[in-house]
Amino acid sequence: MSHFSIAGMQLSLPCGDNLTTIGEEITKTKKRFPWVDMIVLSELLTYGPEKKYAEKLPSKAEIFYCELAKKLDIWLIPGSDYEIDGDDIFNTTSVINNQGVVIQRYRKIYPFCPYETGVSCGQDFVVFDVPQGRIGVAICYDLWFPEVARSLVCLGAEVLIYPTLTGTIDRNVELSIAEATAAMNQCYVIAVNGLGDYGNGKSIIVAPDGSVIHQAGINKEIFPVEIDFALVRRNRERGLHGLGQPLKSFRDNSISFAFATKNNRKSSELSKLGELKIPKS
């Protein structure tokens, strides 16, 4: 079988310890949709976007989610939490399998600078396997950087999952980016946003052809969907409607993208943009 079911949970929760409420919501979702294989939460849902809740891993929250995943026999991507590692704080998501084991941890590569201050950049891309195929994970603002998605896809990702927390007026731009990311990489894109003081919802699931499977509104919503990994492979092998095969073209082209190296990113042209800081009036 090539099908794998994923439910996104778009919730409104305050800053503070939300573990009990989240556990109840996950349990209710699994009871209502027993066929769901994985549940995905929004970014920083457990405690909210305050770094005073940062913990070393494995944390109380991560252990809680592991026990819940094992109890319910379900995969979990429980949004993200701030992680302390030495002198650094990372925005980190855990990937927990249905035996309750953390199989991967991903640190957000692109914190939302200059607003998400005091958060270090992750350095590693993360993909993981479920029985039906391979999934890549990134977080929120990572979506704005096509290099992240393409790197995950080159590692074999067929589904890209983005726990997200944004309440800004550019949400509709992000939805367009999600659609384009799915089409350009011939994969599913799932971006689960939060609600309340920091999130404006509009979570989205996009098919490998760039079409929107579901877009949530601005209220609490649980949205399960069945992913078909065979559809991803067919689109990549044959092209959408037998047309473009961009991943094969990317693979076979001889060009090297010099701009992607660290030195070239600091070119004179990009340096003209000035310092990365919050604009003044």
Task: State where each predicted segment sits.
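C-terminal beta-strand edge segments of enzyme domains
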Residues: V127-D129, G194-S281
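Cys-nucleophile CN-hydrolase/nitrilase-fold catalytic domain and related Cys-dependent amidase chemistry
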Residues: L13-Q99, R105, G167-A183, C187
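CN hydrolase (nitrilase-like) catalytic-core segments centered on the catalytic cysteine
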Residues: L57-L76, W144-F223
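Active-site catalytic loop in hydrolytic enzyme cores
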Residues: I63, I84-E158, T168-S176, A180, ...
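Extreme N-terminal starter segment of soluble prokaryotic enzymes
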Residues: M1-G8
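Residue-level recognition of beta-strand->loop/alpha-helix junctions
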Residues: Q10-S12, R107, N193
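Short loop/turn motifs at secondary-structure junctions
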Residues: S5, P34-W35, R134, G156
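Eukaryotic scaffold repeat domains enriched in small/polar residues
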Residues: N18-T20, T29, K71, C121-G122, ...
